[in-house]
C-alpha cells in the first residue's frame, strides 16, 4: 500500500465529487487565468475546474505518481505536477487555489494556510474542503483497533476547528466564508464502508502491516463497524460524513 489506488478511490466517485461541486459553486470568481488544484488525485476535481474555466491554465498537484498518471490520461488539456503541496511553488500568482479533501493530510495548518494565501493574487480565492470525521465511528474505531492490536497511531490529526480557521485566514488578510455539512451516504453493507475508507483514511493504518496483520485488523474493524452502524429497515446503512468548507478571498 505504498501508493494511492486511483481505481479504488474512484469506486465512490460520485460521492467524493459532490463536495467538490458544492465548494466550487461558492467560489465568487467569474474569470480566472491561473488555477491550482492541490491534491488533485485522479483529476475528478480538476475536471470540474476545467469545465467552469476552459481557457484557464489549470495545474493539478499531487504527491502520488499513480494519481498523477491517471489525471494526465483523463485531462490532457491540463497540467499535472507530482509534488508535495507544502513545497510546490507556482510560476505566477494564482487566481484560485482549490483543495478538495487534501489539506487534512498535512500538519501545521497555522503555517500552511497563510502560506497558501500568500500564493494568491489580490482578490484571489482559497477554496478548501476537508473531511471532519476524526470523531466519527469510522475513524474512532481505526484508533481503537490499532490500540487493541498494539499498533502505533498512524492516523491524521484532527482539524483545527471552525473558529481557528476563521482567525487564521482573517489574520492572513482574507474575507472568510466557512460552513460545515454532514452527508449521509447510503451504503449497501459494512464491507462497503471498509472499501470506502481503505482508499483514504484507513491507508496509513494498513500500509506498514503484513498481509496477515492487515487481515486481522480489517476483521476486527468490520466487527466493530457492525456494532456502530445499524441497518436501516431496507437493509441499507447510513454513513454520516461531516465535511468542513472554507472559501477565503484575499483582500490585502
Swiss-Prot record:
Organism: Escherichia coli O157:H7
Annotated gene: tam
Transmembrane segments: none
HAMAP family with a match to the protein in the record: Tran_acon_Me_trans
Protein known as: Trans-aconitate 2-methyltransferase
PANTHER family given in the database record: TRANS-ACONITATE 2-METHYLTRANSFERASE (PTHR43861:SF1), TRANS-ACONITATE 2-METHYLTRANSFERASE-RELATED (PTHR43861)
Keyword Transferase: yes
InterPro entries attached to this UniProt entry: Methyltransf_25 (IPR041698), SAM-dependent_MTases_sf (IPR029063), Trans-aconitate_MeTrfase (IPR023506), Trans_acon_MeTrfase_C (IPR023149)
Function, in words: Catalyzes the S-adenosylmethionine monomethyl esterification of trans-aconitate at high affinity and of cis-aconitate, isocitrate, and citrate at lower velocities and affinities.
GO molecular function, one term: trans-aconitate 2-methyltransferase activity
